[in-house]
A protein has these predicted regions:
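Hydrophobic membrane-embedded alpha-helices
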Residues: 6-10, 16-386, 396-400
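Short, hydrophobic/glycine-enriched beta-strand segments
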Residues: 11, 17, 460-464
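Glycine-rich, phosphate-binding/catalytic loops in enzymes
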Residues: 40, 478-481, 529-532
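Structural recognition of the beta-strand scaffold that forms the well-ordered cores
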Residues: 42, 67, 111, 461-462, ...
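Short, structured coil segments at secondary-structure junctions
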Residues: 106, 478-479, 536
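Alpha-helical cap/lid subdomain in secreted, periplasmic
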Residues: 246-247, 254-255, 497-549
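Extracellular/periplasmic envelope-modification machinery, especially enzymes
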Residues: 350-503, 507-510, 521, 549
Length: 549
């Protein structure tokens, strides 16, 4: 297949994307819309895959499909497999509780259908009260892999039938609209959004926007020189597009209905505009994104994506409480992510190595020496046998863990899920008739009768996360007129719509107790906004409980 030329400023855009994704998981209160950055990768994938297929078809009248797939999947497979071996070996040695159900996670990821498997078993991208798997982020690679396989075949069929690349543009636009519509229709407000977040059908619009742009504005056209006045306009438009994206990344929450009913589609359209503007050399933003730090990160964006989630999930499961000196914990995780990603980059991008137990590896290679150089900061001879021996040892440990891994539901997690589900159902029932509720006032052990009577008649609103849900029964037993508003993984900055709804239902009482902070920290500005939305006339109390996640 014809090799598509690399766009240096778009590498810089990849850097911005992976930075946003990582900080969404490390500091979600700082960048609550960072999850939207995956759309950048989807759009760039659609852009370059479409450009490559059209270019080869126009030059040769056909597509070397087998060669195309081999090249694409070779770049994905070996770094992916190496990451999974290292992480599984680590889990086997140090965090054996995460071996539960590990086999289907690995098989679905290597088989490139992880996103649909997660949907089928009800895995949630947004639940944070326990670590489900260090491989949860691999849904992303499965979606991209499915696009790699299917879209070129669709394009070949269209080109063979209509002999005009504009049919690809029309098809891409139509499919993007259908996909966005499917996301909006399948999303159920108030329920977990993982189905529409993971689905290839509901994320297709981002790829299609990239594909449409590739037909309308191929990179060759974007390289054409323009007058300085046009360049200034491009810069102004680029700054405006990045400003809009900045607002989206800082304000579009994963819990909002708007996000899935048009918001994510609009975000992808805006990213598409930013891609075209960024790629043009006359745009000043293009010059900024050519800086070496952006290029360094952008060229390693795939390895950074592979490693960030295992590091974050395993570190936070091990440390448990990162609220004490959070800056230090963030720095440690960033260093680990960068180091592991750089090792992978040196081995698989610079050295083009294959893991030493695949079909292309030969025993004689073990005793050869290869020169390793690059941004690790040294040059010299790297003994292949050390690499091979270490890889085989890690593989054996990982295989041992896989053999020992059990299937089934974590008993503690299952009990907590059932308790929370029951509490949510009861919470809705409680809130429907909170003001008219009447029940016998029983004595409560440890509380004086006077206190029991006062608590029973107190008008209190409780707002919180799964911690609140887990104790809602006990709260209502004591506070007979309470309104309880809880949700799994809720964070303080996600409460704007909740407060507005409580006000609309006239259930925001003069006393408000807040159970938030277990799922992450928040900024002073977010706290001030929260207090303002509640109202300064209210009596406001905060309770935060640190629990193992």
């Amino acid at each position: 297949m014809t090799v598509q030329k690399r766009s240096v400023p778009l590498d810089g855009m990849r850097a911005l994307a992976i930075i946003a994704i990582i900080f969404y998981h490390l500091m979600p209160h700082v960048l609550p819309g960072g999850y939207l950055a995956v759309n950048i990768f989807f759009i760039l994938t659609g852009f370059f895959v479409t450009a490559s297929v059209i270019k080869e078809y126009s030059e040769k009248g056909k597509l070397a499909y087998k060669s195309y797939l081999s090249r694409r999947f070779h770049k994905l497979f070996f770094p992916l497999l190496s990451m999974m071996i290292v992480v599984t070996a680590y889990i086997t040695l140090f965090q054996r509780g995460l071996l539960l159900n590990l086999r289907p996670w690995i098989l679905s990821s290597l088989g490139m259908f992880n996103n649909w498997w997660q949907i089928s078993v009800g895995a949630s991208y947004f639940e944070q009260f326990y670590v489900q798997s260090p491989f949860m982020h691999l849904w992303f690679l499965s979606v991209i892999s499915q696009f790699y396989i299917i879209w070129p075949l669709v394009m070949l069929l269209l080109l063979a039938l209509y002999k005009d690349k504009r049919i690809i543009l029309y098809t891409a636009v139509l499919l993007s609209l259908f996909s966005a519509l499917a996301m909006g229709m399948l999303y159920v407000p108030g329920e977990d959004a993982s189905r529409v977040y993971y689905g290839t059908d509901t994320r297709l619009f981002s790829f299609m926007i990239g594909s449409a742009l590739s037909v309308v504005w191929p990179l060759e056209r974007l390289d054409e020189p323009v007058p300085k006045q046009i360049g200034r306009r491009l810069t102004l438009a680029g700054l405006l597009s990045y400003a809009v994206l900045g607002v989206m990344f800082s304000s579009m929450l994963d819990s909002q209905a708007f996000t899935y009913r048009g918001g994510m589609f609009l975000n992808s359209v805006m990213i598409g505009i930013a891609v075209v503007l960024t790629a043009h050399p006359a745009n000043f933003i293009s010059k900024i994104l050519r800086f070496k730090p952006f290029q360094w990160i952008g060229r390693r964006s795939f390895l950074l994506y592979l490693w960030y989630y295992p590091v974050v999930s395993l570190y936070q499961a091990k440390v448990v409480d990162t609220s004490v000196d959070p800056g230090r914990h963030v720095l440690i995780q960033l260093v680990l992510i960068l180091c592991l990603s750089e090792i992978g980059y040196q081995l698989f991008e610079k050295e083009r190595r294959k893991i030493p137990f695949g079909p292309s590896w030969r025993l004689g290679d073990t005793f050869s020496k290869r020169k390793l150089s690059g941004s690790l900061g040294f040059t010299g001879h790297f003994p292949e046998k050390i690499f091979a021996t270490g890889s085989v040892c890690l593989l054996l440990i990982a295989l041992t863990g896989l053999v020992q891994a059990k299937s089934g539901e974590n008993a503690d997690v299952q009990e907590l899920r059932e308790q929370i589900a029951a509490s949510q159902s009861k919470m809705e029932e409680i809130n429907r008739d909170a003001s008219a509720r009447s029940r016998a006032i029983n004595n409560i052990e440890g509380l004086e009768r006077e206190v029991v009577l006062f608590a029973h008649d107190a008008d209190i609103t409780f707002i919180g996360d799964s911690v609140l849900l887990s104790v809602s029964d006990q709260l209502v037993t004591i506070f007979g007129r309470a309104v309880v508003e809880g949700a799994v993984s809720r964070q303080l900055y996600q409460t704007t719509e909740v407060i507005a709804d409580l006000k609309k239902r006239e259930q925001l009482h003069d006393t408000v107790v807040v159970f938030l902070g277990s799922n992450g920290t928040f900024t002073r500005t977010q706290m001030e906004r929260f207090i303002k939305e509640i109202g300064t006339s209210k009596d406001l109390f905060f309770l935060t409980t640190n629990v193992p996640r």
